Amino acid sequence: MGKKAIQFGGGNIGRGFVAEFLHESGYEVVFIDVVPQVIESLNKNKSYEVTEISEEGEKTKTITNYRALSSKTQEPEVVKEIATADVVTCAVGPNILKFIAPVIAKGIDAREEGLPPIAVIACENAINATDALRGYIEEHLDKSRLDTLPKRARFANSAIDRIVPTQPEHAGLNVRIEKFYEWAVEQTPFGEYGHPDISAIHWVDHLEPYIERKLFTVNTGHATAAYYGYKAGKKTIHEAMAEETIHKAVHAALDETASLIISKHEITEQEQKEYVKTIISRISNPYLEDVVERVGRAPLRKLSRKERFIGPAAQLAERGMKFDALLGSIEKALQFQNVKGDDESTELAKILSEKTAAEATQQITGLETDHPLYQPVLKVVEKVQSVSK
């Protein structure tokens, strides 16, 4: 029997990043989704194209050997597929992990003895997303068999990095995506079984440096460009980065996060400098045509405690280091309100208009009132509220 991977989420990241590399490593991919049109389209079309974009030009790959099931209407079939699969991956968004956990738990419980444990890897823009998914899965597992879980499933955190820009209107299943990618995954959880054979993955012993470097450089920089760009009326990230004041604001924020990364991890100043240079070049890429509203969407998640702004700024504040530029990013993110098609931006506007500055600061950022970052952020919230009212 050939290798089989279950991919929760048939969206652009699922099709254009995860499934691309699973396909290239010889896996049959079974997509699991809840959107009928996505499932129908995947089952009707026996192939789709992934076009990698770079300054050198474009390269198109054809993806085949996949199927799709609905976790909403075909749960028994999904459970059977998981019970006989080698790998489960997901790209559904951190807030959706708790909803996919019950069916994964049923699939793990249905695995026959003697099969090697299934590899579970969450591919989300969040720190330790697989740990979070595992927690939700364990809530739904047969409690009498929890002690045998390591024989049935192994869970590994990952750090993913690839920009998927706004897609052309009638792209269908085809995905346009940047050529650059990084997919780092912990190898230690697999122990004596060894990690699955996925050639695109960079297997590492310690993931935190990769996760923090990526989240606090790529995501911090990308979102800073989006929020400054939105406020300045720019259409794309490329247009935003072409304006000197925005370019400087992004660079300043990344200088601050770089100082944290260098002081905390075994990454040299020169290494991080080169990494920042690469990231700024990537997000400035004119060929990606990345719309600021897409990159800025979900501001409440992006302003949360462990995320790309508050996360590094809080650690810098704890160390007595500079975080002024990040406060500027936070201010612009707070101004991303009532954006069409983005529920979180509407909710953000509601919180800022209805709550006191102290209530809003705690609800949005999760900062403790005695934290050294709390007062500076409170002042930013007060400033944004005074302008909004």
Curated annotation (Swiss-Prot):
One of its GO terms (cellular component) is cytosol. GO terms for biological process: mannitol catabolic process. It comes from the Eukaryota. The keyword Oxidoreductase applies. Disulfide bonds: none annotated. It catalyses: D-mannitol 1-phosphate + NAD(+) = beta-D-fructose 6-phosphate + NADH + H(+). One of its GO terms (molecular function) is mannitol-1-phosphate 5-dehydrogenase activity. Keywords: NAD, Oxidoreductase. Its EC number is 1.1.1.17. InterPro entries: 6-PGluconate_DH-like_C_sf, 6PGD_dom2, Mannitol_1_phos_5_DH, Mannitol_DH, Mannitol_DH_C, Mannitol_DH_N, NAD(P)-bd_dom_sf. NAD(+) binds at A5, I6, Q7, F8, G9, G10, G11, N12, I13, G14, R15, G16. The active site is at K214. PANTHER family: ALTRONATE OXIDOREDUCTASE-RELATED, MANNITOL-1-PHOSPHATE 5-DEHYDROGENASE. Belongs to the mannitol dehydrogenase family. Catalyzes the NAD(H)-dependent interconversion of D-fructose 6-phosphate and D-mannitol 1-phosphate in the mannitol metabolic pathway. HAMAP family: Mannitol_dehydrog. Monomer. This is Mannitol-1-phosphate 5-dehydrogenase. It comes from Talaromyces marneffei (strain ATCC 18224 / CBS 334.59 / QM 7333) (Penicillium marneffei).
